[in-house]
UniProtKB/Swiss-Prot annotation:
It is found in: Cytoplasm. It comes from Arabidopsis thaliana (Mouse-ear cress). The modification S-nitrosocysteine is found at residue 114. Catalyzes the formation of S-adenosylmethionine from methionine and ATP. The reaction comprises two steps that are both catalyzed by the same enzyme: formation of S-adenosylmethionine (AdoMet) and triphosphate, and subsequent hydrolysis of the triphosphate. This is S-adenosylmethionine synthase 1. Keywords: ATP-binding, Cobalt, Cytoplasm, Magnesium, Metal-binding, Nucleotide-binding, One-carbon metabolism, Potassium, S-nitrosylation, Transferase. Pfam families: S-AdoMet_synt_C, S-AdoMet_synt_M, S-AdoMet_synt_N.
Length: 393
């Protein structure tokens, strides 16, 4: 049996880029909670002792940007300079302007009240992917890397591994078998964890705790064997982290946010963007489409692409590829997808309830992945029943 290796990575909520994603989405939540028609394009950057929020926001909401920044940093665990940032003492800079009126009139059709006529917020192409290799219909390499990162945060915050600090990265290499286009995971080949830690802990303690409290609870035993390779803090020291260690910027972890390198990516980031930005809403609807194709048994694996022009409601193109795993031809699946999903931005917003912010709805998406999550707020993960005629055996 011929196999191959595929690797996916993830980063923790304390990684500087992910900190920025979370602040941008916390701002989005605050705007949408008070004004569901808010137009938000919020970027964040950070470096030692500084966080800056900037972009274009048109909203009726009253938003305390500085408070959102400090609250988000504090919730992650950035409470002193020695962990990488002090939420209460860092400088917070804000440079927010209103959305360009040129964009507004093109996108909103001179502020039409008709959702069917709302144009795309920009040009671009987005991809959705699904695979039957996990219950989440997500790639195993990505699922494991993401869950390891989430588990690191859990054992830090609950005190199981008190030596942990907020920043960290994970990476998982899985050995796969290609079963006529479908991906079948055989085993975990390599596990890599690099996590920020305090001065007091030894490398041996780090390795022992990571294996016992992070890897064991996350990676199913059937995927681990005596040949599995573990690289646990291989650099030997990771005390300086967070924005003190590296600059951070919104939108730099787009593969971690999606499918861990599987499928494809159109290049647009998600965080800090309201649903008129098809970078986000378009990617959400094609995930729902791809997941529904696989969940309905039409194929074992599916990729769906959609593309847009700024100001135009109808998509320019919709594409489906089942990697030759479809029980019916891809062109028939494409027809079903186009009949079953409304790809117009105004209708995607309604059908996926994307104007509803608050309660950390979009903040939750900004760490540990936008897809494959079992959470009612992730409306794009709901499988849609599709009508199709299964061929006779």
């Amino acid at each position: 049996m011929e196999t191959f290796l595929f690797t996916s990575e993830s980063v923790n909520e304390g990684h500087p880029d992910k900190l920025c994603d979370q602040i941008s989405d916390a701002v989005l939540d605050a705007c949408l909670e008070q004004d569901p028609d808010s137009k938000v394009a919020c970027e964040t950057c950070t470096k030692t002792n500084m966080v800056m929020v900037f972009g274009e926001i048109t909203t009726k909401a009253t938003v305390d940007y500085e408070k959102i920044v400090r609250d988000t940093c504090r919730a992650i665990g950035f409470v002193s300079d020695d962990v990488g940032l002090d939420a209460d003492k860092c400088k917070v800079l804000v440079n927010i302007e209103q959305q360009s009126p040129d964009i507004a009139q093109g996108v909103h059709g001179h502020f039409t009240k008709c959702p069917e006529e709302i144009g795309a917020g920009d040009q671009g192409h987005m991809f959705g992917y699904a695979t039957d290799e996990t219950p989440e219909l997500m790639p195993l390499s990505h699922v494991l890397a993401t869950k390891l990162g989430a588990r690191l945060t859990e054992v830090r915050k609950n005190g199981t591994c008190a030596w942990l600090r907020p920043d960290g990265k994970t990476q998982v290499t899985v050995e796969y078998y290609n079963d006529k286009g479908a991906m079948v995971p055989i085993r975990v080949h390599t596990v890599l964890i690099s996590t920020q830690h305090d001065e007091t802990v030894t490398n041996d303690e780090i390795a022992r705790d990571l294996k016992e409290h992070v890897i064991k609870p996350v990676i199913p035993e059937k995927y681990l064997d005596e040949k599995t390779i573990f690289h646990l803090n291989p650099s030997g020291r990771f005390v300086i982290g967070g924005p003190h260690g590296d600059a951070g910027l919104t939108g730099r972890k787009i593969i971690i946010d999606t499918y861990g390198g599987w499928g494809a990516h159109g290049g647009g980031a998600f965080s800090g963007k309201d649903p008129t930005k098809v970078d986000r809403s378009g990617a959400y609807i094609v995930r729902q489409a791809a997941k529904s194709v696989v969940a309905n048994g039409m194929a074992r694996r599916a990729l769906v692409q959609v593309s847009y022009a700024i100001g135009v409601p109808e998509p320019l193109s919709v594409f489906v590829d089942t990697y030759e795993t479809g029980l019916i031809p891809d062109k028939e699946i494409l027809k079903i997808v186009k009949e079953s999903f409304d790809f117009r931005p105004g209708m995607m917003t309604i059908n996926l309830d994307l104007k509803r912010g608050g309660n950390g709805r979009f903040l939750k998406t900004a760490a540990y992945g936008h897809f494959g999550r079992d959470d009612p707020d992730f409306t794009w993960e709901v499988v849609k029943p599709l009508k199709w005629d299964k061929p006779q055996a």
